[in-house]
């Protein structure tokens, strides 16, 4: 028993004994703290202890040779008060840069398994000891009560992507704890009103927003998005309003608990493709000083591969790195009750040590079958910066879903009126069956989205033809050039009544399409009230009104907000949209694709009208069938549309018609009944009809 352990040695003035070699990181145990860390090529490891915020360690405890088994160092240090110390490591070993081995015993090394990193609590403030990261032991005790995870079916997910700081940092958010986990918690009633059932938080692992700090034209620029991870086991302390030492992470747990209590799942955007250490010119604070040639993909002469576009690439399928990633995800699932993960540039996770794509990557397979991660949602951004594009072909083992980039691209182009896209758009709406075999993966593998953090907001997509990224400081060369956007007749904000009305209609068309598509849905926070980034499609460095949500727009664009609420509720109400795999009792196909002529899917080059019908057994009215028709006319003029015939006694009732502004949402007591199954659809509009029995 741990409580019976006694010291066996004295090192550096501390009573110690060999530690628990299976207990990674620094962990409070009875009588002291257990420290464990691994290095293959080091010849010496020293534990450094600091007083809070001190620059120089007050104690150096070199691990005795007997405290090393294999490549693992472990020591239990007695008498430490976890509140009164911080720690780091020093490693000594060979310096052979041509082999990628670059030990420097003068460097303070951050524990990769650290649960909290000090000196990061004040957003936008440079560290007192720049480039030096120290860790703190965390009290992980938290009472989850009777709270259980929602465990929603994948196909029912309506994911709301947000940035923790940007979501509430603007004064218009009305919250007390702006830009923090607590600020999101204050907005839970809003999320409930909107109707989403999952949030996807952009990176929350510890990162240093000052890591790429610079000044451009008097504007301070930061690593705002947080995709350069400093520590993978520690939540970003600058996202916490309560900075009580030894309890880091408690505020995030409270947020997760309250979201779960309200039926909302939590998905984390995680970055295992690279780290904040960069390339040969980058900082040196963790993996570089432990086993640089193991943790990173290196060229034969010891340089860094750069498939991430960020300076280095984690060697994800190396067994040690693979185990590290698995340990990390298990920790977030067990300690924070996280429901799912979206993996940034996930195709890198399928490359071997020299960057060659693998058929069956060990890491991806181990994550798919790990028992702790069973039921956890795994979502891949199925491409990388090295040219590997795997949408529709990402190794899945029927467990991995994908951000469907083809859905985004095809629907953006189709909705703005491009030709030769009707068939592709119809495939995307009906679950991308050409990409995801319904008999194997199915549409659950397709996370559909039209907007996300990377690119234009939905409002900007219909307000700008070109990106406007000058504020980023790269002379407008950064960010994608091919946005498939359309400004509707004027670049940026305008007082033109017709253009503004058209923009609102296009926004509604896009969101209605997303809500009537098969597969999990994702949209960007703020799209529901026309949030703008003023044409910036790469706001990674903008900690200001460019990236912060402007909540005053919720009232200004109240009709858009109400439309989003209605469409989310509609999708939830009619389950056949999200789960139409069963057969309807009247032998209608679960999904059928139409043109402006019912039961005809002959699309020509100039076809810009799609009709989709979902049919299935009603879950609410026993013995009845359910029919939903979604039609989109991307043409700029009227098109006469014939809806499919229905069983005897059923008729089509119109619920949505964006060509009928401002009454585009038709109240149920005023629904238009299409007795002749025909409607003259306005240009650039969508309709949604429900087959009901009278």
What are these regions, as identified by a protein language model?
Residues 158-160, 199, 266-268, 341, ...:
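Hydrophobic faces of well-ordered beta-strands that scaffold small-molecule active sites
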Residues 87, 91-146, 209-229, 281-303, ...:
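Core domains of carbohydrate- and sulfate-ester-processing enzymes
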Residues 171-185, 464-469, 663-675:
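Short, polar loop/linker segments at the starts of domains and inter-domain junctions
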Residues 163-182, 186-338, 345-369, 435:
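Substrate-binding/active-site clefts of carbohydrate-active enzymes
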């Amino acid at each position: 028993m741990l409580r019976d352990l006694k010291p066996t040695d004295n090192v550096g003035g501390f009573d110690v004994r060999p530690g628990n070699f299976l207990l990674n990181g620094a962990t409070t145990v009875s009588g002291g703290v257990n420290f464990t860390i691994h290095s293959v090529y080091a010849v010496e490891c020293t534990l450094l202890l600091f007083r809070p915020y001190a620059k120089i360690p007050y104690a150096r405890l070199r691990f005795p040779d007997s405290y090393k088994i294999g490549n693992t160092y472990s020591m239990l240090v007695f008498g430490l008060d976890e509140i009164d110390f911080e720690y780091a490591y020093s490693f000594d070993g060979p310096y052979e840069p041509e082999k990628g081995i670059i030990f420097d015993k003068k460097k303070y090394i951050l524990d990769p398994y650290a649960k909290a990193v000090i000196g990061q609590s004040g957003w936008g403030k440079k560290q007192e000891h720049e480039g030096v990261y120290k860790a703190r032991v965390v009290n992980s005790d938290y009472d989850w009560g009777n709270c259980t995870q929602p465990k929603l079916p994948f196909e029912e997910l309506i994911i709301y992507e947000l940035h923790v700081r940007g979501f509430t940092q603007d004064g218009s958010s009305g919250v007390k704890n702006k830009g923090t986990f607590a600020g999101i918690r204050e907005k839970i009633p809003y999320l409930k009103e909107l109707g989403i059932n999952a949030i996807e938080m952009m990176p929350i692992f510890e990162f240093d927003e000052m890591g790429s700090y610079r000044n451009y034209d008097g504007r301070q620029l930061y690593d705002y998005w947080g995709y350069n991870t400093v520590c993978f086991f520690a939540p970003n302390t600058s996202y916490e309003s309560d900075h009580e030492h030894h309890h880091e992470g408690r505020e995030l747990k409270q947020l997760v608990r309250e979201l779960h209590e309200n039926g909302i799942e939590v998905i984390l955007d995680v970055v295992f493709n690279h780290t904040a250490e960069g390339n040969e010119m980058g900082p040196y604070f963790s993996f570089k000083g432990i086993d640089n040639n193991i943790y990173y993909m290196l060229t034969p002469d010891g340089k860094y591969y750069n498939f991430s576009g960020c300076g280095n690439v984690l060697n994800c399928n190396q067994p040690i790195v693979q185990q590290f990633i698995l340990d990390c995800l298990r920790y977030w699932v067990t300690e924070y009750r996280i429901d799912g993960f979206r993996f940034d540039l996930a195709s890198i996770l399928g490359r071997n040590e020299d960057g060659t794509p693998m058929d069956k990557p060990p890491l991806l397979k181990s994550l798919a079958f790990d028992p702790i991660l069973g039921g956890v949602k795994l979502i891949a951004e199925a491409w990388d910066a090295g040219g590997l594009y795997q949408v529709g072909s990402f190794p899945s083992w029927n467990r991995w879903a994908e951000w469907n980039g083809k859905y985004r691209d095809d629907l953006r182009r189709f909705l703005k009126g491009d030709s030769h896209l009707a068939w592709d758009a119809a495939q995307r709406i009906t679950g991308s069956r050409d990409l995801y075999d319904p008999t194997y993966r199915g549409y659950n593998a397709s996370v559909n989205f039209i907007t996300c953090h990377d690119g234009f907001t939905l409002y900007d997509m219909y307000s700008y033809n070109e990106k406007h990224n000058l504020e980023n400081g790269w002379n407008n060369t950064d960010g994608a050039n091919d946005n498939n956007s359309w400004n509707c007749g004027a670049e940026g904000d305008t007082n033109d009544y017709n253009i503004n009305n058209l923009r609102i209609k296009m926004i509604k068309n896009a969101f209605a399409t997303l809500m009537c598509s098969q597969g999990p849905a994702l949209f960007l926070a703020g799209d529901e009230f026309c949030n703008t980034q003023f044409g910036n499609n790469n706001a990674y460095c903008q900690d200001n009104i460019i990236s912060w949500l402007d909540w005053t727009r919720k009232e200004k664009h109240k009709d858009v907000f109400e439309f989003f609420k209605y469409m989310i509720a509609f999708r939830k109400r009619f389950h056949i949209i999200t789960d139409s795999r069963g057969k309807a009792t009247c032998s209608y196909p679960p999904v059928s694709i139409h043109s402006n002529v019912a039961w005809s899917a002959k699309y020509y080059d100039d076809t810009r009208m799609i009709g989709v019908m979902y049919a299935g057994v009603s879950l609410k009215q026993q013995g009845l069938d359910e029919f939903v028709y979604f039609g989109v006319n991307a043409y700029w003029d009227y098109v006469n549309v014939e809806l499919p015939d229905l069983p005897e006694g059923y008729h089509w009732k119109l619920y949505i018609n964006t060509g009928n502004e401002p009454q585009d949402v038709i109240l149920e007591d005023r629904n238009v009944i299409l007795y002749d199954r025909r409607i003259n659809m306005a240009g650039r509009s969508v309709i949604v009809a429900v087959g009901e029995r009278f």
